[in-house]
Amino acid sequence: MKNKIVSAAEAAAVIRTGDTVSISGFVGIGTPDELLLGLERRFLDGGEPAGLTLVFAAAPGDGGERGLNRLAHPGLVKRAVGGHWALVPKLAQRAVDGEIEAYNLPLGCIAQLYRDIAAKRPGLLSRVGLRTFVDPRLEGGKLNARTTEDLVSLIEVGGTEYLLYKAFPIHVALLRGTTADTAGNITMEREALSLDVLPAAMAAKNSGGLVIVQVERIAQEGSLDARRVQVPGVLVDCVVLAQPENHWQTYAQRHNGAFSGQIRVPLDRMAPLPLDERKVIARRAAMELPPGGVVNLGIGMPEGVAAVAAEERVLSYLTLTAEPGVIGGMPQGGLNFGVSLNPDAVIQQNQQFDFYDGGGLDMACLGMAQADGQGNVNVSRFGKRLAGAGGFINISQNARKLVFAGTFTAGGLQVAIEDGRLRIVREGRSRKFIEAVEQVTFSGGLAGETGQPVFYVTERCVLRRTAEGMELTEVAPGMDIGRDILAHMDFRPIVRDPRPMNPRLFQPEPMGLERWLLGLGLADRISYDAERNTLFINYEGFHVRALDDVEMVRREVEARCRAIGRRVALVVNYDGFTLDQAVSDAWF
């Protein structure tokens, strides 16, 4: 069989002017920087290829020079169709300035669209995006006046509205893996995510296009475990061996085995967050976590929810997920966003969104840049600043419970937490609760019609989107409703009888989230069956942190036994029981 190993320059030479090029990557995870660098060099050296259309689900970039930022040269790109834009600011600026045609479509819909392109279907049929800026009745996902072609249309099936995301051919797919044999079979054992490499490869191949894959090592043909091959060689045209500096696992770390499943690391040694407004918000959002549920945490403020869950020892009761395909473990933030420490599974990105879109998330906690009196939220565009929706629309529209998390105002906000009370030291310059959001990334009206529970959590108050509108439901200790809340809103929420936010949110010690979520005190864990003369003790998820906890258990069990007045049989459930090593050493 033909040897498919080529140089980056040789791979770039097969891309033609006017091609539609799909690029893998989520931040720096799976981003083929060796290939992008080769493409950039070819264009700078000879002016070709030119007029490319770029297609990317997430934003393969670092907010600076890497990823798609390499391709922002005038003339190289004619059109870009992307899900998230915040980390490709050079390309985003060209879109905002109207220098290229540009679209922002939901990340999950682009990921799913690859399958429809591969299967030669007319497009993706989905309810995701209805009543948001992606809906053609609003903006159709178009980012500037230069962009005129409709990629999204509204159709009705059986009396129900859907959006049809138009399919188009993929001429070249630029992908990344770990190992390739000389026949082009690709494995991804050191990659933190699988992303969309397989459906994108199929989309390009069935469009009559080319598939080029960057890897970090080459193996002999036939030596790879067939069950670990994620892209079969029949789909791959060229393989490029990357330089190590262009193949980091994430843009923050060269390689971490706990991201890719080679090792597991302890999660109980992480330093707790400092007690500030971010922790208060994360704690209040964490109080909505569903024990035993599946959760998505967004980028930014919601990242703190995972840290609070770890500090409070409740991660074992949850399955945290991230949209590019990780299930379980502890999702990471910053330039590691999208991966998880100690994941239970890593699936393809489009499969994750199938699960999300069908209502698989019990709860999502997402960021909130602007909200209005209808409950609409904007996180995607602010004047000349283009962030993009990413997976926000898929996730927010379909989660069974939705929590938006963010400070009440932005731009220089300073608060103090003293004696369990909140004090505003300096108010933020920008209001976030405004008359009308600049762009509708989440439709409060649609949520009201579907009955979706939606909370807006800030450091000083909590609002909820009800059938009647936005209602103020909780106020932080130390806050005056008129002075500190209503005076900094452009709309007036419903104010009935808001209750105080839980005082434990504002205390430095752990807040006892486990007991709050489970609602199960020690007395509730002990029951007696008189007919069988058996005492049942349920220690499931119970955590003994100090000798005082041991003494508390002893007293409760002795009291129950004295009340029974005779010897009993004992059945104990220790599933998920935890005994701190220091207590074990002191006791035994």
Label every model-predicted segment.
Residues 20-25, 53-56, 573:
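Short glycine-rich or small-residue beta-strand-to-loop segments that form or flank ligand, phosphate
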